[in-house]
């Protein structure tokens, strides 16, 4: 066949081959689309919860019965009672005017104290008292004036609720002041009187010839004290409200003598009237 004839035969064959190639490309040729990926997209992180502020628990309102004409007494004892309920651990350091062991014992029955305080208060000669359920809570005027009244708690009807421990602690506080180491920086004679005021004749021996307390006349008789032995203190009743505390006292010269301090009960509890 001539060249034109061969070209005529070849052209259809090429066309057939090309056609077959195109047809096969859609089945088994090189893929024209990427296969689906095996990678799984991580879920979007959940939105964080908005921060919430928990409001502080409300401070319990301690109910204190009114004292006609003396609202300061109510406020002062409420400040103490609120601490007793909400922050009892802070009370001992704040109530340094009482013997520590005595305060711990008297303040143990919180419910009895709150029950008494809820009753109307009575403004007496030297103290304000609340009584209820067989318990009396009494605060001295010096405690009220401080704005934070640490009371005496005692059975209702008790007349002489001050104890020898109160007398010994009064001597401890006085000697601590004299040795320039007060039990608290606020413990001064002006704010918390420890020397008997002399409202009544000083007469521990019952002679009938009493006068002003000697310590009132000479308050510096124990000035220069450098040390004293609290663990060696002894308290001895004398007569009526009078009580004598013996205590070894060391002066600036280093000499130690046992001193006898006579006390009585005054407006602020046990007060010192005489030193021998």
Question: What is each model feature region?
Answer:
Residues 25-47:
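Short, low-complexity, disordered segments immediately C-terminal to signal peptides
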Residues 1-15:
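N-terminal export and membrane-targeting signals
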Residues 109-115:
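A cross-kingdom feature marking solvent-exposed beta-strand/loop segments within repeated
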Residues 25-27, 118-166, 253-276:
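Short beta-strand edge/turn micro-motifs at domain boundaries
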Residues 211-276:
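Extracellularly exposed regions in secreted/surface proteins, prominently low-complexity, repeat-rich
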Residues 20-23:
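C-terminal motif of bacterial Sec signal peptides marking the signal peptidase cleavage site
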Residues 54-109, 157-209:
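Core segments of small alpha/beta cavity-forming domains
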